Amino acid sequence: MDRKSIESIFNRIRTANCLVIGDLMLDEYLWGKAERISPEAPVQVVDVVREEMRLGGAGNVVNNLVELGAEVTVCSVVGDDDNGQALLEAFGRRGVATDAIFLDATRRTSRKTRVVAAHQQIVRIDRESRVPLSAEVERRVSDWITANAGGFDVILLSDYQKGVLTPGVISATLAAARPGAIPVLVDPKGTDFSRYSGATLLTPNRREAEAASGIAIHDIESLVRAAGVIMERVGLEHLLITRSEEGMSLFSRSAAPMHIPTVAREVFDVSGAGDTVLASLAAGMAAGMEMIEAARLANITAGIAVAKLGTSTVAPAEIINAVALAHSDSDSKIKNRDVLAVLIEAEKARGKRIVFTNGCFDLLHAGHVKYLQKARTLGDLLVLGLNSDASVRRLKGEKRPLIGEQERAHILAALDCIDYVVIFEEDTPLELIAALKPHILAKGGDYTPEGVVGRELVESYGGRVELVSFVDGKSTTNIIERVLERYS
């Protein structure tokens, strides 16, 4: 899987029509600081500084599919309450069809509250209903599925055992999918996977696979035996077992097992990782990918997701970037403004501090390199804004630049201290800074803080300006003068 092929896949995903059926939840996050112990009991006191609501459960599957570019309809049941209304409004903002979300005044909409401080989840509070649907509500859901499910490219069952995926609802789904051979992908729960008999693929994690098979998984041999038991009992064509830091393994009736290693990443939170896997697999299959290629896509996507805190989505730009970096191509560091803004936002979500600097960098020399190396030490990632050829001409005259923008960008991207290069057309980088919102704005020591373009903007949201000293006597102008003196 290379950059061109993954870009082509995302173009096809935009035409995919997906149906998600399952348990919806509202995920509430309370972000704060835990710097005190309560005088009432030996527990931490959290000072809340930010509150956030996210789509959870099957809603996170929907959110991931939308982020990947697919068209999505969701079928579920929520309570006739404020949390249920909040879910409907959130789906509306994402452009998700909600005609098949049924209100049930006898149910409580699931809401999970997570308290987070210093990038750690301290406690989770659950308010939810776990009882199966009433016979009347189950009939309404099943009737809708029978009438409509046959018109989708792929169907996803997201089971959190909160009562929506009753045997009747699952049976109606599988029956509706059968005539058109529509793939049905399931993120299962419980120990009896036979309830999903007739599905195309299940995506249990290792713990769930152990419980369903009755086999303790401690090596590849036991993993293969557990997979065989599950596939035989459920009558599956495919089974994907996720194995945390060991990646994932795909088992198919018509092919040998494929073990896909994980991409090494710092793990912040595994919340919703299974949702990401299910959504990525479905999107890939709807785009016409072979099962193994869809599994590789899911592996890459999940690796990005677990590096974020909380139930999070992964943008196509992040996946394309990960694929490009895996091919060790320094040119993959060169991004346009829109793509880079998405990547930088994702890096911030991982707690990374972003340093930004800019310049023409015509005739790269040792002074430039020393400056950039120092700037990189100010944070976790260094983004370099590079003046375009037209911008350089306006700033330095018609005879400059000596090196074209693409060549300059490729040379700079080859430096280990630079994480991203972005070319800008304006005379100043102000618009680029506004788009990226770096934590630190670095400029050469020949500036004063007041003279740095973007200082007021960066300081307005809590960032800062850092002046980095240059190497004396090193400049492009000096190099040009020496060349003219010696060779003219």
From Swiss-Prot:
Chemical reaction(s) catalysed: D-glycero-beta-D-manno-heptose 7-phosphate + ATP = D-glycero-beta-D-manno-heptose 1,7-bisphosphate + ADP + H(+); D-glycero-beta-D-manno-heptose 1-phosphate + ATP + H(+) = ADP-D-glycero-beta-D-manno-heptose + diphosphate
Alphabetized CDD domains for the sequence: RfaE_like (cd01172)
InterPro entries associated with the record: Bifunc_HldE, Cyt_trans-like, PfkB_dom, RfaE_dom_I, RfaE_dom_II, Ribokinase-like, Rossmann-like_a/b/a_fold
Gene Ontology molecular-function annotations: ATP binding; heptose 7-phosphate kinase activity; heptose-1-phosphate adenylyltransferase activity; phosphotransferase activity, alcohol group as acceptor
Chain positions covered by the region annotation Ribokinase: 1-330
Pfam family, one: CTP_transf_like
Highest rank taxon of the organism: Bacteria
Transmembrane annotation, as ranges: none
Positions bound to ATP: N205, R206, R207, E208
Disulphide bridges: none
Region (Cytidylyltransferase): 356-488
UniProt pathway: Nucleotide-sugar biosynthesis; ADP-L-glycero-beta-D-manno-heptose biosynthesis; ADP-L-glycero-beta-D-manno-heptose from D-glycero-beta-D-manno-heptose 7-phosphate: step 1/4; Nucleotide-sugar biosynthesis; ADP-L-glycero-beta-D-manno-heptose biosynthesis; ADP-L-glycero-beta-D-manno-heptose from D-glycero-beta-D-manno-heptose 7-phosphate: step 3/4
Keyword line: ATP-binding, Carbohydrate metabolism, Kinase, Multifunctional enzyme, Nucleotide-binding, Nucleotidyltransferase, Transferase
Active site, per annotation: D275
GO terms of biological process kind: ADP-L-glycero-beta-D-manno-heptose biosynthetic process
Function of the molecule: Catalyzes the ADP transfer from ATP to D-glycero-beta-D-manno-heptose 1-phosphate, yielding ADP-D-glycero-beta-D-manno-heptose.
The family this protein is said to belong to: In the N-terminal section; belongs to the carbohydrate kinase PfkB family.
Assembly and oligomerization: Homodimer.
NCBIfam families: cyt_tran_rel, PRK11316.1, rfaE_dom_I, rfaE_dom_II
Name of the protein this chain belongs to: Bifunctional protein HldE
Source organism (scientific name): Pelobacter propionicus (strain DSM 2379 / NBRC 103807 / OttBd1)
